[in-house]
Swiss-Prot record:
Gene: metK
Protein name, as recorded: S-adenosylmethionine synthase
Oligomeric form and interacting partners: Homotetramer; dimer of dimers.
Annotated binding of ATP, by residue: H15, D174, G175, K176, R247, F248, D256, R262, K263, A279, K283
Any one annotated GO CC term: cytoplasm
Positions bound to L-methionine: E56, Q99, D256, K287
């Protein structure tokens, strides 16, 4: 088999772009908590000493946006100008308008209801925009996620944990990780390189303090966790690069401006799957950029969990104002155990991919989104992440899902 290297990256919650994502989703949650029917599209720009929040919102709720912004920044850990930002004293500018009535009419009264006279309640809500969304799953990890992004997220999360719990007290909130894994064909076989870049206090020696601490308290525990999870990966002799530029004292918004929606590959599958281009954070679930991407993860994960393929990528496409998708495509990269046409047929029978049905089946009108905004939207076993359930493998609550005549090889 041919050997190749594949790389994915992650960032900590203190990365400027991730601060912006978390602020946008915190505002979204506050509005959904009071009014689950809120229509929200909130973007955040953060730079030295200033946060600017803009977008379109139609809601009956009230959210103290400036207060929410400051609380989130302080929670992340930016509480001093020495760290590059202070949530207590930063400026907050808000420019929020209402959702365009031209968009609202297509969402509130879908083409099927408005033009075709369809009375099905689920046909009343149209897609909030045109677009294409992808979902992906594979059997490389128990979470059915690609191993490179899985490990990169775990390293980023631990980097934040050892900062917050005082294990490495001189770390600051901004940080990045990157993982390069060698594949033999489609099988992950060896860890090649780990890159960890972390903002730190001044006067910290890289070689004698930071690098050994990162290896001992961040990287090695996560490699041990892989073994405990039953993931077989050769890790002897991997290369560890810690802050390869040298000093990393200036970080956060002082080092780089942050924007909502600039980490869409980190948010999804680390580049292992295609991406439709739409970001997630700050968008309520009437926006199919978000809800349909979650649904596609749900679909792909159930396909792999059912044993129909070891790798599955699913694409769905919508027209603005229409409820029914205009396209569905399944790719299994040659790993399918039955014909992909039958998998696609089963998906169409098992999953209702109209926006209102996705929102209903995944219970997406809850204030659950701020916790999605760092360390990945997929592959996390949290009860709020309903799109991670494999509840359609055996047809729970519905007629037999993976029907014997459609899927003869399923266990």
């Amino acid at each position: 088999m041919s050997r190749r290297l594949f790389t994915s990256e992650s960032v900590t919650e203190g990365h400027p772009d991730k601060i912006a994502d978390q602020i946008s989703d915190t505002i979204l949650d506050a509005l959904l908590r009071e009014d689950p029917t809120s229509r929200v599209a909130v973007e955040t720009l953060i730079t030295t000493g200033l946060v600017h929040v803009a977008g379109e919102v139609t809601t009956k709720a009230y959210a103290p946006i400036a207060q929410l912004v400051r609380e989130k920044i302080l929670e992340i850990g930016y509480d001093s100008s020495k760290k590059g930002f202070d949530g207590a004293s930063c400026g907050v500018s808000v420019s929020i308008g209402a959702q365009s009535p031209d968009i609202a009419q297509g969402v509130d009264t879908a083409y099927e209801s408005r033009v075709e006279g369809d009375e099905d309640e689920l046909d009343r809500q149209g897609a909030g925009d045109q677009g294409l969304m992808f979902g992906y799953a594979c059997d490389e990890t128990p979470e059915l996620m690609p191993l490179p992004i899985h490990l990169a997220h775990r390293l980023s999360r631990r980097l934040s944990e050892v900062r917050k719990n005082g294990t490495i007290p001189y770390l600051r909130p901004d940080g990045k990780t990157q993982v390069t894994i060698e594949y033999d064909g489609d099988k992950a076989v060896r860890l090649d390189t780990v890159v960890v870049s972390s903002q730190h206090a001044s006067d910290i020696d890289l070689e004698s303090l930071l690098a050994p601490d990162i290896r001992e308290f961040v990287v090695e525990p996560e490699l041990k966790a892989l073994v405990e999870d039953g993931i077989k990966l050769e890790t002897e002799g991997y290369r560890l690069l810690v802050n390869p530029t040298g000093r990393f004292e200036i970080g956060g918004p002082m080092g780089d401006a942050g924007l909502t929606g600039r980490k869409i590959i980190i948010d999804t599958y680390g580049g292992m799957s295609r991406h439709g281009g739409g970001a997630f954070s700050g968008k309520d679930p009437s926006k199919v950029d978000r809800s349909a991407a979650y649904a596609m993860r749900w679909v792909a994960k159930n396909v792999v969990a059912a044993g129909l393929a070891s790798r599955c990528e699913v694409q769905v496409a919508y027209a603005i104002g229409k409820a029914e998708p205009v396209g569905l495509f399944v790719e299994t990269f040659g790993t399918n155990t039955i014909d992909t046409d039958k998998i696609e047929q089963a998906i169409s029978e098992v999953f209702d991919l109209r926006p209102a049905a996705i929102i209903r089946d995944l219970d997406l009108l809850r204030p659950i989104y701020s916790q999605t905004a760092a360390y990945g939207h997929f592959g996390r076993s949290l009860p709020e992440f309903t799109w991670e359930k494999t509840d359609r493998v055996d047809g729970c609550g519905r007629p037999p899902v993976w029907r014997a005549d459609l899927l003869p090889l399923v266990h």
